[in-house]
Each structure stands twice: as structure tokens, then as C-alpha cells.
Design a protein with these regions (language model features):
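Conserved glycine-rich cofactor-binding loop
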Residues: 30, 37-38
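Conserved glycine-rich Rossmann-like NAD(P)H-binding loop of the short-chain dehydrogenase/reductase
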Residues: 51-67
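The beta1-alpha1 cofactor-binding region of Rossmann-like NAD(H)/NADP(H)-dependent oxidoreductases
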Residues: 80-91, 123
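Conserved mid-core segment of classical short-chain dehydrogenase/reductases
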Residues: 89, 112-127, 170
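Active-site helix of classical SDR
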Residues: 141, 177
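Residue(s) in the substrate-gating loop at a strand-loop-helix junction
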Residues: 161
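C-terminal helical subdomain
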Residues: 201, 217-255
Length: 280
């Protein structure tokens, strides 16, 4: 992305929207984070715990949940899979019984894959990102919303991506899932306008996480990404400022550029998705 375009945009930009969040302190809350054993989810758990919140994270692997507990003293963990409605229902029963004061849900679980659409895939495997990134978040909201609506000042944070605004052709299903998450979150915010629950969308840019670097190592060679600790600080500051959309760094550029130069931005993303070669 041209440096002139980066410099022309403020670091974080969001218009007030119907149902936008109220200013709130992220202190003394009970927070449930899906996909909290690594990357953004784990860093969010660390920072929120340090600020005096009671934090619960979910994940699919017992060994990673144990590692998260070791990394974050006082962390509560549950094995759960957002792709499985029965698993979500069981999680709801457990959390609502043990943590009836739950007032914050962070839909962070997800996967990002490099997919070539001219290759052969099993149909259910091809849409795995839709199941985890989109359907899982919708199901989590549907399951936990009745509990959250009982507490004034509750919060739902849906984690989308800067790619919700300009797709990354190397990750087509991921891009589609995050664009849909953006639309769903806007609708959820509008429908819950005036209710007890505020709706926030966090759209991270490329972020230094194992998921991102492992899957796109060739394409991202030499490219910069936001430090995950810095991203989470942006997220918490945005929530406390009452921003309905939090778009740190390049995500803000993508949102604005998608409106003023959509074709140009898509071409840039096509170039970015090509594997780097020596001497290039």
C-alpha cells in the first residue's frame, strides 16, 4: 500500500453508528474469549487479566489450554469448538452456571488459509473458514445473548479483519467470511440499538501471530505486520472510547481506500498475494 495513502489516513477511524457502544472501562468485567490459546485471543486474555478482569478462554486442544493457563495466572479455560452447535450449547450451560456475571463476549476464534480455487477440495473442507469464522460467531451470539441482555453495559466484540473491506485473493474464503462478519455485526448493532448490549467490531490488520506467519510465510516475506500487543492495546482503548468499529493501522487505510479506489486496492492485494522470489 503506498506510503502516501497510509499517511493520509488517521490511525483509527470510525463514524458513530446506530447501536454504537457506550464508553466503558475494561476493568472488573467477566470476559469470555473464543480461540484464546494463541495470537490475538491469548494476548487479549493477558492484558485483560492484568487490568483486573475475570477472563475465560476456549479452545479445541487441551494441551494449548493448559499452556494458556500457565501463561496467564488466574485464567479460566474450557475445551470447546465453535464449529459444533452442541459444543456451544454445552459451553453456555457451564459458563452461565459458573459465571452468571458474564458481561463480555469476544468472538475471536477463526482460521485463515491459503486456498487456490482451481485446485480440488472436499466441499466441507473448502468452507471450513465459513464454519469457524462466521457461523461459529453467529451461534455464540445466539447462545449467549439472553445472558448478556440481563446485564446493562454488556459487550459483544466480533473480530473481523481489514480484509473485510478489501479482499486478499490468496485467502478467498477467509476474506469472504470476514466481509460477512462485518455485515452481520452491523446488522446486530442496528437491531440491538438501545438494548443492554453494545456491539463492537475489531478489524485487525496483518498481525504478528503464528497463524498468519505460518500460512502465508512466502507471500509475507519482507512485509511488516502489527505487533499483537500493540493491536490489543488499540482494541482496549477503542472499546473504552466507545468506538463501534476499531480499525488499527492498515485496516483503517483499507476501509477508506475501498471506497475511494477499490480497483486499485484489489490490484495491490493481488500483488501482495504472490509468493516472493529471490531478487524480486
Amino acid at each position: 500500500v503506498p506510503s502516501s495513502l497510509r499517511e493520509a489516513c488517521p490511525p483509527d477511524y470510525a463514524h458513530a453508528q446506530p447501536g454504537g457502544s457506550q464508553t466503558m472501562k475494561m476493568i472488573g468485567r467477566t470476559v469470555l474469549i473464543t480461540g484464546g490459546t494463541s495470537g490475538i485471543g491469548l494476548e487479549l486474555a493477558k492484558q485483560l487479566t492484568t487490568r483486573g478482569n475475570r477472563v475465560i478462554v476456549t479452545g479445541r486442544r487441551a494441551d494449548r489450554l493448559e499452556a494458556a493457563r500457565q501463561a496467564v495466572p488466574g485464567l479460566h479455560t474450557f475445551e470447546s469448538d465453535v464449529r459444533d452447535p452442541a459444543s456451544i450449547e454445552a459451553l453456555y450451560q457451564t459458563v452461565s452456571d459458573r459465571f452468571p456475571s458474564l458481561d463480555t463476549l469476544v468472538n475471536n476464534a477463526g482460521v485463515m488459509r491459503n486456498i487456490k480455487l482451481d485446485q480440488s477440495y472436499r466441499l466441507d473442507d473448502l468452507t471450513a473458514e465459513i464454519d469457524g469464522n462466521l457461523k461459529g460467531s453467529i451461534w455464540m451470539v445466539q447462545a449467549f445473548l439472553p445472558l448478556l441482555l440481563r446485564r446493562q453495559g454488556s459487550l459483544i466484540v466480533n473480530v473481523s479483519s481489514g480484509l473485510a473491506f478489501v479482499p486478499f485473493p490468496a485467502a478467498p474464503i477467509y476474506s469472504a467470511s470476514k466481509a460477512a462478519m462485518h455485515a452481520y455485526t452491523q446488522c446486530l448493532r442496528a437491531q440491538l440499538d438501545g438494548k443492554a448490549v453494545s456491539i463492537v467490531e475489531l478489524a485487525p490488520p496483518a498481525t504478528e501471530t503464528p497463524l498468519f506467519r505460518d500460512e502465508f510465510a512466502e507471500q509475507m516475506q519482507g512485509e511488516s505486520a502489527m505487533n499483537v500487543s500493540v493491536l490489543v492495546k488499540h482494541a482496549i482503548a477503542g472499546i473504552e472510547a466507545g468506538k463501534p468499529e476499531i480499525r488499527p493501522g492498515l485496516s483503517n487505510v483499507l476501509k477508506i481506500a475501498s471506497r475511494v479506489a477499490p480497483s486499485f486496492m484489489l490490484r495491490q492485494m493481488v500483488k501482495l498475494g504472490r509468493p516472493k522470489t529471490s531478487g524480486a
